[in-house]
């Protein structure tokens, strides 16, 4: 059985959104301090690491630059702007920036509010 190493890097951004057609209060504009956790995996290490934490942080920060203090309804890729859709979008952005044949993005989780989170992962 092959061993897998993983690392996790987290960050946060603040944004507003609304969920049109939602039967509850989320149909109205409201905001969150979103927390994001990205998990990367590799079966081999380079210089003892899956990836440099700072490289992963920079890739996350590039995502946050597009989302922080924005209205997520104005970001076409985030339709509808649910935590699940945000997690999938960040996953794709990180995959494009960080995957190299050795390292893969394993999972991205987005915490919308305390105790409420969604994750996106793809089977390798």
Regions picked out by a protein language model, each given a short descriptive name:
Residues 1-124:
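Charge-rich, low-complexity N-terminal segments
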């Amino acid at each position: 059985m092959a061993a897998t190493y993983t690392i996790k890097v987290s960050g946060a951004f603040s944004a507003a959104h609304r969920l049109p057609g939602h039967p509850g209060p989320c149909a109205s504009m409201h905001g969150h301090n979103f927390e994001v956790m990205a998990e990367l995996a590799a079966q081999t290490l380079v210089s003892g690491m899956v990836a440099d934490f700072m490289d992963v942080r920079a890739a996350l920060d590039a995502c946050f630059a597009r989302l922080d203090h924005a209205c997520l309804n104005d970001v076409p890729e985030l339709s509808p702007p649910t935590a699940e859709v945000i997690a999938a979008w960040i996953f794709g952005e990180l995959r494009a920036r960080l995957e190299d044949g050795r390292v893969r993005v394993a999972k991205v989780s987005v915490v919308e509010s305390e105790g409420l989170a969604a994750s996106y992962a793809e089977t390798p």
